[in-house]
Amino acid sequence: MKNEKLPQFQPHFLAPKYWLFWLGVAIWRSILCLPYPILRHIGHGFGWLFSHLKVGERRAAIARRNLELCFPDMPENEREVILQENLRSVGMAIIETGMAWFWSDSRIKKWSKVEGLHYLKENQKDGIVLVGVHFLTLELGARIIGLHHPGIGVYRPNDNPLLDWLQTQGRLRSNKDMLDRKDLRGMIKALRHEETIWYAPDHDYGRKNAVFVPFFAVPDTCTTTGSYYLLKSSQNSKVIPFAPLRNKDGSGYTVSISAPVDFTDLQDETAIAARMNQIVEKEIMKDITIYMWLHRRFKTRPDEKTPSLYD
């Protein structure tokens, strides 16, 4: 079941205006040939550089506010430690994205392991909503799982057509297909064909098709209702969370797959969205330092006239 809408390589991608982009990709791929322990140091260096750029300072302010909103009872100095580690992780994410897109299967397997794979194998005939969260390791996590259990990714097309093509090629290295995050019909069809779809419900996509439910200490977080439509349209599908984690000792990565979460007792979209947020919270707490705190998770408020939480 291939998606014919996937971006295709275009001859004009070789035009002079893209040459600088191609040079950057060539340098990126060359760096990725280095041993993994060296790549870790380079990634941390990128993170240090990011934190000292203006864009990094802006994102750091957003991340600091997100942590304050989610964990108001946590001492400020503890939140600051998490923030600094998170900023350092941003640089490593650049390296890990390249690993996911360009490394060979054998090299990926050498530096990774999967725990809980049996949950996918035992439920693959029912269709699986593989709930991911926006960890900085998400690209690599999808590649690792795909080597053991290929599935279908859900993504937002990139505004840059060349980057959109490149990221699609990278994401298909060990997976079956990609679907636009707005293609709910395609997701439902995939589940009914007993496929596994990677689905991340933890970004603020605006008030359309959304409800406001708790997320950590924020009681009214804008949360997509896509989960409701997926589960009600394919009622046999299993919801299975996973988290791609960095091993603290520098030995690579562990993808942690959890047991299926039951949603059969819930009937309305608000309750389903709230439980999905609880799943996301649990996964985030497996390593709070690698979550994408740099996004404005709480930008949409229930009342449009309410002041922004980021002002």
Swiss-Prot record:
Localization of this protein: Cell inner membrane
Q: Which InterPro entries match?
A: LipA_acyltrans, Lipid_A_LpxL_LpxP
| Transmembrane feature ranges | 19-39
Q: What Enzyme Commission number(s) apply to this enzyme? A: 2.3.1.241
> Mind listing the GO molecular function terms for this protein?
acyltransferase activity; Kdo2-lipid IVA acyltransferase activity
Q: List the disulfide bonds.
A: none
Its cellular-component GO annotations read:
membrane; plasma membrane
The alphabetized list of GO BP terms reads: Kdo2-lipid A biosynthetic process; lipid A biosynthetic process; lipopolysaccharide biosynthetic process
Q: Name one Pfam family in it.
A: Lip_A_acyltrans
Keywords, A to Z, come to:
Acyltransferase, Cell inner membrane, Cell membrane, Lipopolysaccharide biosynthesis, Membrane, Stress response, Transferase, Transmembrane, Transmembrane helix
User: To which pathway does this protein belong?
Assistant: Glycolipid biosynthesis; KDO(2)-lipid A biosynthesis; KDO(2)-lipid A from CMP-3-deoxy-D-manno-octulosonate and lipid IV(A): step 3/4; Bacterial outer membrane biogenesis; lipopolysaccharide biosynthesis
Topology versus the membrane, per the UniProt entry? Answer: Single-pass membrane protein
Q: Which reaction does it catalyse?
A: an alpha-Kdo-(2->4)-alpha-Kdo-(2->6)-lipid IVA + a fatty acyl-[ACP] = an alpha-Kdo-(2->4)-alpha-Kdo-(2->6)-(acyl)-lipid IVA + holo-[ACP]
Which residue ranges does the UniProt annotation give for the motif HXXXXD motif?
134-139
Per its database record, what is this protein's job?
Answer: Catalyzes the transfer of an acyl chain from an acyl-[acyl-carrier-protein] (ACP) to a Kdo(2)-lipid IV(A) to form a Kdo(2)-(acyl)-lipid IV(A).
Q: Which family does it belong to?
A: Belongs to the LpxL/LpxM/LpxP family.
Annotated protein name in UniProt:
Lipid A biosynthesis acyltransferase
| Species the sequence originates in | Haemophilus influenzae (strain ATCC 51907 / DSM 11121 / KW20 / Rd)
